[in-house]
């Protein structure tokens, strides 16, 4: 699965969560897939969620790592 697919699954599983964290290893791939660059605080908006870099060796999750 691609980073964007993993993010879609996480969002679908927890649609009320305001944020999503993506592992550092997948961050560049995810940003390229949605054709966005992080803003000044390092977040992007995808499907009305604030998406951030979750750090190395983490999962794609809606809960803060």
Residue ranges and their predicted role:
Residues 2-17, 56:
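N-terminal acidic leader/helix
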Residues 16-65:
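Extended oligomerization regions of viral-like shell subunits
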């Amino acid at each position: 699965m691609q980073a964007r697919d993993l993010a879609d699954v996480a969002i679908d599983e927890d649609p009320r969560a305001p944020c999503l964290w993506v592992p550092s290893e997948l961050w560049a791939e995810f940003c390229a897939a949605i054709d966005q660059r992080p803003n000044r605080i390092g977040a992007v908006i995808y499907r009305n969620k604030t998406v951030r870099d979750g750090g190395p060796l983490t999962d794609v999750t809606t809960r803060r790592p």
